[in-house]
Design a protein with these regions (language model features):
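Active-site loop/lid in soluble adenylation, ligation, and acyl-transfer enzymes
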Residues: 1-146, 254-262, 266-311
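Catalytic cores of nucleic-acid ligases and guanylyltransferases
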Residues: 31, 182, 209-218
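Short, active-site-adjacent segments that bind or coordinate small-molecule cofactors and metal centers
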Residues: 91-93, 189-197, 202-204, 272
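Conserved metal-phosphate-binding beta-hairpin within the catalytic cores
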Residues: 102, 194-215
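A short mid-domain helix/strand-loop element embedded in enzyme catalytic domains
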Residues: 134-166
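A long amphipathic alpha-helix within ATP-dependent nucleotide-binding catalytic cores
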Residues: 164-195
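C-terminal helix-cap and adjacent tail motif
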Residues: 215-278, 282
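N-terminal low-complexity segments that are often proline-rich with Ser/Thr-Pro
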Residues: 306, 310-334
Length: 334
């Protein structure tokens, strides 16, 4: 846990710690912790928290025209110096109880579902697709938000509608698909494929939908090199797959039941290098320069009214068939 004596800690996830920052805002601190199979390793990956924060800030600013997001700043007096570079001041939201997953390629749990049923989250796909194959169109495959230690469960869109209401579920789906498309275009320009990603959303003070949590980071998105992409086999990715591969190798000594063992130095270094490379490829910036110009550490002025919850956007769901989430104390960190 990241110690901040002057802040009240609200929650801790596998990677992030959440603190109070007044009535309308929260402070999210990304640690260097790394997890696998719903456990946290005793070994951290130096600089990982900075990568997650820097990459989220880049994407929050890059995609702010698609949908308002909760990011306010990662600079200024509300950011303690001890966590500067890996902390975000964000708007407090009513979080939706559904994760929005978009898949552009057939991999991971999506591929497992397809092999078993020919569909992913109730969406039928063409027969004969290989692992890592590009899908005809990106698909929206929501999931539940599991408690810590449990696994998220894929759900179909009908179940998503029953949880959120039709109007809100459709808005979440359309926003998620557009965010994915925009992210995939940027990734392609940098020689990467955005295989899949997850988004989280909440409801702001004005009743509108707001993008939350992290955005298109190596922890929440699967990036592959476009060069050498080969359907039919798993692809090397810019995330913690290297850690998982080491862990399931018999040489690690892990029995799938005991607490996770320490990571070898070479695995830590290789993992850090993949995270840093993902950031530098996507942004064209050096992580060594983060945090940089204060003007790049805040939401653009034109967006602050919306992202701070004080804008005058009309609630798109008012008087429509929508289920409001119960008032939650905080975003639950992962």
């Amino acid at each position: 846990v990241t110690p901040l004596p002057t802040r009240r800690r609200l929650a801790s996830g596998k990677v992030r710690d959440l603190y109070e920052a007044g009535d309308d805002h929260l402070l999210i601190v990304a640690s260097d912790r790394i997890s696998a199979f719903e456990q946290v390793f005793p070994t951290s990956v130096p600089g990982k928290g900075r990568v997650l924060t820097a990459m989220s800030v880049f994407w929050f600013r890059e995609l702010a025209d698609v949908l308002p997001n909760h990011f306010v700043t990662c600079d200024g007096p509300l950011i303690p110096e001890s966590v500067r570079g890996r902390a975000l001041l964000v708007e407090r939201l009513d979080m939706l109880p559904v994760e929005a997953v978009v898949r552009g390629y057939l991999t991971g749990r999506g591929y497992s579902d397809y092999r078993r049923s020919g569909a992913v989250c109730g969406l039928p796909l063409p027969p004969g697709l290989a692992e890592s194959a590009r899908l005809p169109e990106p698909i929206f495959t929501p999931s539940t938000k599991a408690r810590r230690g449990d696994k998220d469960e894929n759900i179909d869109f009908g179940t998503c509608v029953s949880v959120l209401g039709r109007a809100l579920a459709e808005e979440v789906r359309e926003a998620s698909l557009e965010l994915y498309r925009r992210g995939a275009v940027r990734a392609a320009e940098q020689g990467l494929l955005l295989a899949d990603t997850k988004f989280e959303f909440g409801i702001g003070a004005d009743g509108g939908l707001v993008l939350a949590d992290e955005l298109l980071t190596p922890d929440s998105a699967r990036y592959w090199l476009a060069d050498g992409h080969q359907p039919g086999v798993p692809q090397p990715s810019f995330d913690k797959q290297h850690v998982r591969d080491w862990l399931v190798d018999p040489a690690s000594g892990w029995d799938c039941v005991s607490p996770l063992p320490p990571l070898p130095p070479e695995v830590v270094t290789a993992t850090r290098d993949r995270y840093v490379e993902a950031y530098q490829r996507i942004t064209g910036l050096s992580l060594a320069d983060w945090p940089r110009d204060p003007a790049d550490l805040r939401q653009p002025a034109s967006r602050l009214g919306q992202c701070g919850g004080t804008g005058d956007r009309r609630d798109p769901h008012r008087d429509q068939d929508v289920h409001r989430p119960r008032r939650s104390a905080a975003l639950q960190p992962r």
